[in-house]
């Protein structure tokens, strides 16, 4: 393994999740039994100091489908739902340090493979996306960890993990208890950190997703899609018109009919409504990219509710809808734009 001047967890962690968990449990028991002569203190980025006591520690589930795998986290005493540091390799690491790397070759979009990369994905998704950078006054949801074998890529930039996206593979189980499988690859979660938005990273991940599955005629985006993500999709499809017929907003398993809506068609119809003055266009940033694919309003691993999608115009193949002629006409107009 390469040795770096200042290594971070993703650079040095071996694929030994059980070993790290056992060490964390032993450390926790030591604190609980008061084996240390004096309590350790960790300084937060805010300047606040937190004493390492069992009341400030919690074990966090790393994988949604394997709840036995956990890591030890230190919570903010002012907000006990927010983890501010994680115990790994017999040391405490701040959230920002977990997202850093000293490996110069770790740049751009890279597939999540190692245990260290799974930890980075967990921190980005559950801690940063789910707590630190969400709009608390708008959204009461928190975000569930990805499954252990979830296909995902992390976008590394200037020595830090700044974005990620995850994919439900064609043929993988939908996870709804019915045994049904996805009928197409589906982009499930997308996130760009606030300080890295408006830099084209969202469209770059969409392009990578489409390029990765070039052999598939149809690709899905998990429903519901946020207005911010729709703006990113609009920009992407304006730049890459060849992808307009491939991208669909889908509900599992993504069958034709009431489970697929063509994204470009929805964009086109929205703009027609704007031209008619029937819809107020929200003024927002170009790339406020966050699409929660796994969210819950209650504690514990609950099934993701895909929400409501408006399908009154076009769902799946136009000729199969009740308003077939009208929808087919609009589809043809959208293709020509």
UniProtKB/Swiss-Prot annotation:
Domain of life per record: Eukaryota
Region (Disordered) residue spans: 278-326
Bias kind Polar residues: ranges: 291-306
Biased composition (Basic and acidic residues): 307-322
InterPro entries, A to Z: FAM169
Assigned protein family: Belongs to the FAM169 family.
Record-linked PANTHER family: PROTEIN FAM169BP, PTHR22442
Protein's name according to its UniProt entry: Protein FAM169B
High-level lineage: Eukaryota, Metazoa, Chordata, Craniata, Vertebrata
Gene symbol of the encoding locus: Fam169b
């Amino acid at each position: 393994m390469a040795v770096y001047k200042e290594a971070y967890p993703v650079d040095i962690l071996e694929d030994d999740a059980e070993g790290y968990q056992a060490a964390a449990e032993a450390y926790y028991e030591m604190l609980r039994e008061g084996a240390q002569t004096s309590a350790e203190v960790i300084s937060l980025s805010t300047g606040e100091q937190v004493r390492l006591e069992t009341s400030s520690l919690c074990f966090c589930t790393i994988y949604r489908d394997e709840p036995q795998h956990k890591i030890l986290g230190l919570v903010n005493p002012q907000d006990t739902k927010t983890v501010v540091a994680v115990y790994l390799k017999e040391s405490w690491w701040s959230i920002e340090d977990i997202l850093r790397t000293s490996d110069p070759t770790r740049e751009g979009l890279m597939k999540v493979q190692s245990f260290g990369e799974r930890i980075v994905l967990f921190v980005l998704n559950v801690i940063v996306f789910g707590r630190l950078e969400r709009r608390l006054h708008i959204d009461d949801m928190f975000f569930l960890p990805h499954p252990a074998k979830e296909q995902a890529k992390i976008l590394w930039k200037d020595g830090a993990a700044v974005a990620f996206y995850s994919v439900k593979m064609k043929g993988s189980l939908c996870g709804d208890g019915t045994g049904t499988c996805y009928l197409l690859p589906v982009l499930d979660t997308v996130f760009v950190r606030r300080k890295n938005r408006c830099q084209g990273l969202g469209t770059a991940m969409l392009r990578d997703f489409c390029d990765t599955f070039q052999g598939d005629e149809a690709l899905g985006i998990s429903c519901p899609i946020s207005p911010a993500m729709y703006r990113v999709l609009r920009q992407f499809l304006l730049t890459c018109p060849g992808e307009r017929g491939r991208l669909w907003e889908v509900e599992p398993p993504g069958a034709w009919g009431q489970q697929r809506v063509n994204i470009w068609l929805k964009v086109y119809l929205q703009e027609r409504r704007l031209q008619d003055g029937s819809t107020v266009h929200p003024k927002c940033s170009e790339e406020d990219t966050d699409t929660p694919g796994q969210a819950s309003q209650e504690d514990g691993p609950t099934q993701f509710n895909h929400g409501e999608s408006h399908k009154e115009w076009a769902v799946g193949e136009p000729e199969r809808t009740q308003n077939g002629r009208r929808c087919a006409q609009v589809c043809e107009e959208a293709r020509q734009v």
